[in-house]
Amino acid sequence: MAPPSATEPQNGTERKLNTTAPLEPGLDDKMGNMQKFKFPRPPTFDDPYKERAYLKGRLAAAFRIFGKYGFDEGVAGHITLRDPVEPTNFWVNPFGVAFSLIKASDLILVDAKGEVIDGGEVRLLNTAAYMIHHAVHEARPDVICAAHSHSIYGRTFCALGRKLDTITQDSCSFHNDHVLYESFNGVVLAEEEGKNIASALGQKKAALLQNHGLLTVGKTIEEAVFWFVSLEKCCHAQLMADAAAAGRGGETVKIGEEEAVYTHKTVGSPMAGWFSAKPLFDVEGRPCIASFPENHLLAFSMHSIGWFLGNSG
């Protein structure tokens, strides 16, 4: 049986006003409208050129987030953004530039024919990026962003030839909402292969590309990025859980269908994906002590020691 709503009184207790978000993250439209707490929403723009500038900044941040997570593998991997000015075009990373170094000015604009028509100094295009992402964007007008890379746990799980089990609350985001693309024909350099991937994806949010890696899509950059990060972690969790269960001669405990469907409505909506990515982008956009140069850390440490000695005893 699906769990009761977190906003309903339990055991005869009176309903009290929630001062914190009552759902986790509780962002599907129907539930969101019922809440006293107003969740933020993605910004909207009247000027598509201003929207383009903003989204390019977010896309560059997305690459740096991927870099921090170690999702880069040599020159493999790409995230694309449908251009708000000309929606048949998309922005993508230049081939060979490290994820962690990408700025908005480095991004390149690719048209429907696969020609680079604008961008930074490096205008090399990864052919596989065009073949996969052009096909996905063309087949799915609702997709603003698509992300693919050869992350370690994702590509490991993709070698098993199976879909993800629903064994955690987080994996409920992908319950009946991801596919297994059961084919590997080498690097995607042919238009037909890109179309096959897009066809297999259908209306789902994610695909496990067998012997290859993960692909996620979203109505916002943030959504696509969060689904990728979350799917990678779900693959990691299942690899560990399956190994631990097998070592004990047992199996993992699966979440029931009704509970999984209920939870997917809460944690698997586009708005849930967008909002869940907020901490990732907030951290990327602000300096923190973990990113300070070593000499700054040393100066900070010496200052702290001096303050402690001067204020103790």
Question: Model segments located where?
Answer:
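A conserved C-terminal secondary-structure "cap"
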Residues: 2-53, 59, 208, 213-313
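N-terminal low-complexity or amphipathic/hydrophobic leaders
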Residues: 21-115
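Flexible, glycine/proline-enriched loop segments at strand-loop-helix junctions
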Residues: 49-52, 118-127, 179-188
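Solvent-exposed alpha-helices and their adjacent loops that cap or buttress functional pockets
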Residues: 71-74, 82-85, 99-102, 137-140, ...
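Short HxH-centered metal-ligating active-site micro-motif
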Residues: 111-156, 191-203, 212
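Short, conserved beta-strand edge motifs with alternating hydrophobic and charged residues
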Residues: 148-150, 181-182, 207-210, 218
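Class I SAM-dependent methyltransferase SAM-binding "motif I" and its flanking Rossmann-like core
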Residues: 152-189, 193
